[in-house]
């Protein structure tokens, strides 16, 4: 610590000022505050620092000194008296004294902590108020510029550590200069407060990532040393002890925030960093946590960010799933968010299907409505890229599909049934789902291949999706809805079993449907497409290569990496049971 080594020189320098008059009392030392160039006095006996010259008659100046040093000098003096368990009347409840170790008196360190840190803290707080204007210059810049100063000012660091736990290393205050020992103490204290910041002087460079150094400029540099005591008094009087500590401290935080505001957004962006900062700063000084200004915001940021993350996860899955269907199965949504997802999907489905069923009797339209509503939230299901963005196109495509393929025809009668009697929306929903299932059933009938085939995976996924959709239908206590749902589930399960039997290979994939909540959301458009493809196949015959290529393209779009999904599916199977 250059400061520590310099302290004797500092004494000499300051000697030019006050110490010219006469020697300091034993145990006292003069140091110069590198920031302001003002001399201040370190009482190693009581381990306090003060702006007031002990050689001045104690009456007024002593009082001023007490105010300068902290809310009350007596308090700080008392601390040393009860060194074993110092009492910190001056500290606000949240604040935690920062241990300050003096180089010279390593053996007495424990006491140093309390007595010394106390005054430092208070002074720093008052000064912080003063300093804030300049500090606002920019903590970051301050950190760099004042890295050098920090070497001298480590001592002050303790104070800053309490006020700005994260920033201690760069907080520069008279403390550094306050005592040659102070340099050590400050460094130790800073290290104590900031595990990551080694020597406080180094600390300025080593600040943990999120931390912003707080340059501390003392207002005193405006006033002359003689005036200092009075100036401090004035400050103290403005803010009685606790206020003195608190108000200035708030400025410190405000300043930090002012300069931090730029970093803050970043912090919000990266919840991890904000927790880090919150945590380390908290370690550094619970005092900081005491001040709602700083900590809460990181915390808030954290929670907010966390919530959005799940949300974002949930919402993207619909988007991505259409594109990589098989992938999405095991994808984050599947295992991680299934619970959340299912409700989301359920809601979407219910919302979509209810209006669908009520609004549009024709099956094709039903499908269209669903498709349009589902894709709208996730406009990037690439399986039907054009269709998804523009529901009208979807409608057209589906209408084509409906008239042309046989699968749509069976669906039509069902929809007709739905139309004729005014049915409960739940029943309509179930019927709409079963229409899709019918198309899938035909796809299953025409399916030949392995369980690893894209087509198999797609059909299975669609069926699973329909299963989940059926599960999501709310019977609302109506027996007819419940019965329809039950029948639909049975039907889907039998189709799934049939598909399994037809497929060769990899057993146990049926269970994937249990995992599929994630796929629910965006599969509807795919399903319609699938239905169309299946219809084409039925129409043209499996031998026809056109439908196959179509389906392959669709599948490729929907499930670009089939194999990854496959292992994932199998993994999912393991999980699902």
Curated annotation (Swiss-Prot):
GO cellular component: ciliary basal body; cytoplasm; cytosol; mitochondrion; nucleoplasm; nucleus; protein folding chaperone complex; stress fiber
CDD domains cross-referenced by the UniProt entry: WW
Keywords from the named record: Acetylation, Apoptosis, Chaperone, Cytoplasm, Isopeptide bond, Methylation, Nucleus, Phosphoprotein, Repeat, Ubl conjugation
Cross-link Glycyl lysine isopeptide (Lys-Gly) (interchain with G-Cter in SUMO2) per UniProt, renumbered positions: 450
InterPro entries, alphabetized: BAG_chaperone_regulator, BAG_dom_sf, BAG_domain, WW_dom, WW_dom_sf
Subcellular location: Nucleus; Cytoplasm
Compositionally skewed regions (Basic and acidic residues) per UniProt: 256-265, 535-548
WW domain residues: 22-56, 126-157
Sections of the chain in a coiled coil: none
In-chain residues carrying the UniProt-annotated modification Phosphoserine: 138, 179, 204, 280-281, 285, 297, 380, 382, 390
One GO-annotated biological process of the protein: protein stabilization
Origin superkingdom: Eukaryota
Ranges of compositional bias, category Pro residues: 332-341, 376-392
Every BAG domain range: 426-503
Record SUPFAM superfamilies: BAG domain, WW domain
Covalent link Glycyl lysine isopeptide (Lys-Gly) (interchain with G-Cter in SUMO1), residues: 450
Gene3D superfamilies the record matches: 2.20.70.10, BAG domain (1.20.58.120)
Region ranges (Disordered): 1-81, 126-207, 229-427, 524-577
Modified residues (N-acetylserine): 2
Record's compositionally biased regions (Low complexity): 158-204
Modification Phosphothreonine occurs at: 291
GO molecular function, one term: protein-folding chaperone binding
Omega-N-methylarginine modifications at: 141, 267
Subunit-structure text: Forms a ternary complex with HSPA1A/HSP70 and HSPB8, serving as scaffold subunit. Component of the chaperone-assisted selective autophagy (CASA) complex consisting of BAG3, HSPA8/HSC70, HSPB8 and STUB1/CHIP. Binds to the ATPase domain of HSP70 chaperones. Interacts with BCL2. Interacts with phospholipase C-gamma proteins. Interacts with DNAJB1 and DNAJB6. Interacts (via BAG domain) with HSF1; this interaction occurs in normal and heat-shocked cells. Interacts with HSPA8/HSC70 (via NBD), HSPA1A (via NBD) and HSPA1B (via NBD). Interacts (via WW domain 1) with SYNPO2 (via PPPY motif).
Function of the molecule: Co-chaperone and adapter protein that connects different classes of molecular chaperones including heat shock proteins 70 (HSP70s), e.g. HSPA1A/HSP70 or HSPA8/HSC70, and small heat shock proteins (sHSPs), e.g. HSPB8. Acts as a nucleotide-exchange factor (NEF) promoting the release of ADP from HSP70s, thereby triggering client protein release. Nucleotide release is mediated via BAG3 binding to the nucleotide-binding domain (NBD) of HSP70s, whereas client release is mediated via its binding to the substrate-binding domain (SBD). Has anti-apoptotic activity.
Name of the protein this chain belongs to: BAG family molecular chaperone regulator 3
Source organism (scientific name): Mus musculus
């Amino acid at each position: 610590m250059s400061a520590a080594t310099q302290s004797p020189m500092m004494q000499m320098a300051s000697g030019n000022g006050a110490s010219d008059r006469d020697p300091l009392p034993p145990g006292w030392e003069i140091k110069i505050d590198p920031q302001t160039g003002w001399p201040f006095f370190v009482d190693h006996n009581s381990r306090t620092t003060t702006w007031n010259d002990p050689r001045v008659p104690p009456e007024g100046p002593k009082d001023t000194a007490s105010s300068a040093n902290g809310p009350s000098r007596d308090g700080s003096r008392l601390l040393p008296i009860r060194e074993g368990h110092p009492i910190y009347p001056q500290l606000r409840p949240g604040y935690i004294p920062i241990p300050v170790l003096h180089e010279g008196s390593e053996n007495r360190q424990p006491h140093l902590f309390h007595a010394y840190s106390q005054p430092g803290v208070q002074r720093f707080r008052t000064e912080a108020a003063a300093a804030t204007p300049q500090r606002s210059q920019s903590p970051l810049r301050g950190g760099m510029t004042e890295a050098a100063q920090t070497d001298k000012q480590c001592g002050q660091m303790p104070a800053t550590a309490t006020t700005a736990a994260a920033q201690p290393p760069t907080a520069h205050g008279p403390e550094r200069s306050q005592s040659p020992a102070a340099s050590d103490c400050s460094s130790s204290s800073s290290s104590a407060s900031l595990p990551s910041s080694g020597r406080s002087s180094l600390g300025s460079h080593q600040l943990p990532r999120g931390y912003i150094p707080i340059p501390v400029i003392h207002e005193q540099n405006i006033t002359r040393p003689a005036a200092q005591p009075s100036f401090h008094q004035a400050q103290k009087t403005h803010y009685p002890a606790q206020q003195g500590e608190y108000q200035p401290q708030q400025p410190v935080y405000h300043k930090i925030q002012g300069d931090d505001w730029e970093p803050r957004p970043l912090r919000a962006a990266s919840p991890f960093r904000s927790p880090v900062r919150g945590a380390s700063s908290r370690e550094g000084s619970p005092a900081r946590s005491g001040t709602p200004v700083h900590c809460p915001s990181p915390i808030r940021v954290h929670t907010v960010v966390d919530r959005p993350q799940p949300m974002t996860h949930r919402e993207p899955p619909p988007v991505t799933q259409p594109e990589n269907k098989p992938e999405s199965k095991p994808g984050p949504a599947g295992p991680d968010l299934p619970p959340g997802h299912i409700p989301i999907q359920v809601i979407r489905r219910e919302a979509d299907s209810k209006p669908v069923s009520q609004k549009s009797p024709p099956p094709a339209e039903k499908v269209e409505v669903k498709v349009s509503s589902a894709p709208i939230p996730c406009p990037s299901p690439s399986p039907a890229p054009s269709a998804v963005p523009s529901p009208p196109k979807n409608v057209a495509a589906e209408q084509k599909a409906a008239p042309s393929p046989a699968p749509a025809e069976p669906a039509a009668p069902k929809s007709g049934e739905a139309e004729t009697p005014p049915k409960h929306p739940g029943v309509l929903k179930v019927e709409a789902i079963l229409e899709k299932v019918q198309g899938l059933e035909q796809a299953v009938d025409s399916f030949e291949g392995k369980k690893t085939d894209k087509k198999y995976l797609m059909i299975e996924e669609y069926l699973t999706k329909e299963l989940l959709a059926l599960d999501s239908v709310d019977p609302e206590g109506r027996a007819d809805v419940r019965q329809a749902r039950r029948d639909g589930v049975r039907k889907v399960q039998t189709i799934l079993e049939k598909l399994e039997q037809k497929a060769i290979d990899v057993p146990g994939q049926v269970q994937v449907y249990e995992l599929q909540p994630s796929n629910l959301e965006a599969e509807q458009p795919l399903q319609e497409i699938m239905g169309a493809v299946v219809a084409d196949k039925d129409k043209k015959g499996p031998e026809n290569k056109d439908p196959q290529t179509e389906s392959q393209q669709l599948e490729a779009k929907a499930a670009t990496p089939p194999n990854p999904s496959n292992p994932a599916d199998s993994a999912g199977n393991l999980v699902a049971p």
